[in-house]
Amino acid sequence: MQVGINTAVYEDEVKAGASQLDCIKTLVGRNEIGAVEVRGEFFKPTTKDTELAAISQLCRDNHWDLYYSVPEELFGPNGYNASLQTNLDMATKYQIKSLKYSLGKVSLMSSSTLSQLRQLLMSSQTQVTIENQPNDNGQLGVVETALEWIKQQLLPLGYTFDSGNWYWIDQQPEPAFATLKSAITVFHLKDIKNQNTVMLGDGDTDWQQLLKALPNTTPIFIEYNIQSQNLPEQIALVQQALS
């Protein structure tokens, strides 16, 4: 099974001045990669469009699916984020398969606002997912309630399960996974020790069992800072767990 790479893997390189395009180019030739997820906050506004166009072409050339992490919340006091339309247009332009937002806080919405959101999501070919956050909006009970509400409102939203974010709100990923498993459409993988991200196998997460419990159609993204020399080993560990 192929593995996805979130560009959080290249945090050190990006902080040192590398572009996400530069980093992703290093994956060319790695047949075990099936998807790439770029991060909105890693782009420079002045070069974003040019870089994203090049990344999109690179993904097509290598038969990788392209995902995009939006550094914003989908839900808030005014209903849903007004950036959704703009980001869906961006996704269409650059052939982005999926947009990921943080959940935010679901508030009461008028029927017309709900209908507008539903139509916006249904009219797009791009999948939109919400993710559990490392704050009060990411508490298991809150996420469970939000996902049930999304289901009741017939909103075609997916759910990105982040296995690391639970630790930063003093919860555990394993019971959360058991509760939310049926809603998971994308999986963000990281291992945590003492609320710090570590290499796979060095933390407290039973990540192998979580991966084995996922349907084999669920995209799995490695999403933590990794020294470049350690990336092949980390990818191999994920593949081994999935084999």
What positions do the PLM features span?
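Flexible, active-site-proximal loop/turn residues at the rims of small-molecule/cofactor binding pockets
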Residues: 42, 105, 134, 193, ...
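Residue-level recognition of beta-strand->loop/alpha-helix junctions
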Residues: 9, 39-40, 70
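Conserved beta-strand positions in the central sheet of alpha/beta enzyme cores
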Residues: 36-37, 68, 100, 129, ...
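Histidine-acidic metal/acid-base catalytic patches
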Residues: 1-32, 45, 88-95, 140-161, ...
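Glycine-rich, proline-tolerant flexible connector loops at the mouths of alpha/beta enzymes
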Residues: 35-56
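A generic structural signal for short
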Residues: 12-13, 43-44, 75-76, 106, ...
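Active-site acidic/histidine proton-transfer and metal-coordination neighborhood
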Residues: 58-159, 168, 234
